[in-house]
């Protein structure tokens, strides 16, 4: 059996949970579509794919689905995972499960995982070691169910899906201590950062804050009063930790 983790994960949070599950089931291979679309690939029934993507406004980020779209299954078992920043995952897990089914995969289980939110100080450090251990145990249980003949699970959510799946509205800016090393420019999922490493195209930026998280000199960030006010209130509203939710076919 070949095991894969197929992920879109700008700050690495969605990747952690999906990778924990995939690696628990065997020697896993990472298919990271954060910076570019997946190459066309067809998987067999003997393979297993763990999909991982972030929740944006209660939906899977639309760009993640676009980049995962070249992957196709042939009755290939998969686990669908979405990661959200402690507010809610709404219709995202249902949406990702539908997406997988439409492309020939058989979702055997799904999970809504809590991760550190992009904005403010919300669930900092998640997923924790305990979260990842839960992920690994869930993957093993899901695989046992599949081998026992259980198929299909019912993720929560509604059709039609709620509005969402787009980027946020807070565009980072660049401080004067920027060294123009090019890391943020080369690592931007949407190619929104200019050649000068300081200018950011607001029409392309999805507010994933990958540049903010990765800048070695902390020159990227949102420094406006509007953002600071929002982040403080949002962090207070979501301070109580939520638990990961796992869905099996029984």
Predicted regions, residues:
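Iron-sulfur cluster-binding cysteine motifs and their immediate structural context
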Residues: 174, 179, 183-206, 210-227
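FMN-binding flavodoxin-like domain, especially the glycine-rich phosphate-binding loop
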Residues: 2-17, 21-169, 224-250
């Amino acid at each position: 059996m070949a095991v894969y983790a197929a992920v879109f994960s700008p700050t690495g949070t969605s990747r952690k949970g999906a990778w924990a599950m995939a690696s628990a089931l065997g020697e896993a291979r990472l298919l990271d579509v954060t910076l570019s679309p997946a190459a066309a690939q067809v998987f067999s029934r003997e393979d297993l794919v763990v999909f991982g993507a972030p929740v944006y406004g209660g939906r899977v980020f639309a760009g993640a689905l676009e980049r995962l779209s070249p992957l196709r299954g042939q009755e290939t078992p998969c686990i669908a995972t979405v990661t959200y920043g402690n507010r809610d995952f709404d219709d995202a897990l249902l949406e990702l499960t539908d997406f997988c089914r439409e492309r020939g995969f058989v979702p055997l289980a799904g999970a809504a995982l809590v991760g550190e939110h992009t904005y403010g100080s919300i669930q900092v450090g998640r997923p924790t070691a305990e979260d990842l251990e839960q992920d690994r145990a869930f993957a093993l249980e899901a695989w046992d169910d599949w081998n026992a003949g259980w198929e299909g699970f019912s993720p929560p959510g509604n059709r039609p899906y709620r509005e969402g799946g787009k980027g946020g509205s807070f565009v980072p800016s660049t401080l004067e201590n920027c060294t123009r090393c090019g890391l943020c420019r080369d690592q931007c999922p949407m190619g929104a950062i200019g050649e000068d490493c300081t200018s950011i195209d607001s029409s392309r930026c999805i507010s994933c804050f990958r540049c903010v998280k990765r800048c070695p000199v902390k020159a990227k960030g949102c420094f406006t009063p509007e953002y600071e006010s929002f982040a403080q209130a949002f962090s207070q509203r979501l301070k109580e930790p939520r638990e990961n939710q796992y869905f099996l076919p029984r």
